[in-house]
Curated annotation (Swiss-Prot):
Protein name as catalogued: Beta-ketoacyl-[acyl-carrier-protein] synthase III 2
Primary gene name: fabH2
Pfam families listed in its UniProt record: ACP_syn_III, ACP_syn_III_C
One GO BP annotation of this record: secondary metabolite biosynthetic process
Gene source species: Staphylococcus epidermidis (strain ATCC 12228 / FDA PCI 1200)
Comment on protein domains: The last Arg residue of the ACP-binding site is essential for the weak association between ACP/AcpP and FabH.
Localization per record: Cytoplasm
Active site: residue positions: C114, H251, N281
Length: 326
């Protein structure tokens, strides 16, 4: 018997505290106009001092449960994608498992930075279609504010906190996942990093220990040069073309970057769904937050063909072409 994986519910959570562009004028030399022109960001959400990634993950799942009235007692795997876990161990996924009371569910964290959520979805699809699991929560959650240097103008204006969750289930007939790909360019990892135990990479010294460091130009050049090829590669696996897409959901890193990717890939810019305007760059949470905003705006409908492409730190990428089944 063939097994299909189907997305059946989605939820999100963002912290209450809002930090808008005007707030940054008091911290670093910048302005609302400068930030909007270069990034497309107006505001972002910031977690409280005692609010951590696991809290955001759990609240996103509660939102999913409340909106769709789904039974989560038989969830058998939790995949949490994050680069800002509460602890080195145990995992954020284990915390969510405990909070939900799912005694026998597997739990794993994935650190693929901004590509994390699409990696998580692809893993969930593989686990379900192989017959190993039946019901999986995939969560992308970040508290990037806790690893942001607010003296560094080039990065502090970009990042925010948030979480999004999808429920992926076994189905006999209907499937969400059509095609996918993934890869990385580790030699360019120095363009976006946050140090932990080591302070060097390929014998090069790294800076600003414990905070995000980004070579914006390097990341931009890599993304615009590679993401269009990634898009065409995953579409070539399917029977669909660029014109067939209802929506394109890239990682919401920067509005200019997304426009350049769309132009090079021949995707209409109004098909690109983004979350950065109100949430900033939330790394692994940007894609589920973008989906949620589009649903609330009445854009996404059942059976829409949607291409999700995550890319960023690593430099890593993962994409998945889905049919919206909610």
């Amino acid at each position: 018997m063939q097994s299909f994986a189907k997305i059946t519910a989605q939820g999100t959570y963002v912290p209450e505290k809002v930090m808008d562009n005007n707030d940054f004028e008091k911290i670093v030399e910048t302005s609302d106009e400068w930030i909007q022109q270069r990034t497309g960001i107006i505001e972002r959400r910031i977690a409280d001092e005692n609010e951590y990634t696991s809290d955001l993950s759990y609240k996103a799942v509660l939102d999913l449960q409340e909106k769709y009235q789904v039974d989560l007692t038989d969830v058998d795997m939790i995949i949490n994608t994050t680069l800002t876990p509460d602890y080195k161990t145990p995992s954020v996924a284990s915390y969510v498992q405990a909070q939900l009371g799912l005694k026998n569910a597997g739990a794993i964290d994935i650190n693929a930075a901004c590509a994390g959520f699409t990696y998580g979805l692809n893993l969930a699809n593989g686990l379900i279609t192989s017959g190993q699991n039946k019901k999986i929560l995939v969560i992308g959650s970040e508290t990037l504010s806790k690893i942001t240097d607010y003296n560094d103008r080039s990065t502090c204006i970009l990042f925010g906190d948030g979480a999004g969750a999808f429920l992926v289930e076994y189905d006999k007939e209907e499937m969400s996942f059509i095609a996918s790909n993934a890869g990385s360019d580790g030699l360019k990892g120095h363009n976006l990093y946050c140090t932990e135990l080591s302070e060097e990479m390929f014998s090069d010294d790294l800076e600003n220990h414990g905070y995000i460091v980004q070579n914006g130009r390097g990341v931009y050049k890599w993304a615009v040069g590679n993401v269009p090829n990634i898009i065409h590669e995953v579409l070539n696996q399917s029977n669909y073309s660029i014109e067939d897409l209802n929506w394109f959901v890239p990682h919401s890193a920067n509005a200019r970057m997304i426009e350049s990717i769309c132009e090079k890939a021949n995707i209409e810019t109004d098909k690109a769904l983004k979350s950065l305007k109100y949430y900033g760059n939330t790394s692994s949470a940007t894609i589920p937050l973008s989906i949620d905003l589009a649903i609330k705006e009445g854009k996404i409908k059942k059976d829409d063909l949607i291409l999700l492409v995550g890319f960023g730190g690593g430099l890593a990428y993962a994409s998945t072409l889905i049919r919206w089944t909610i």
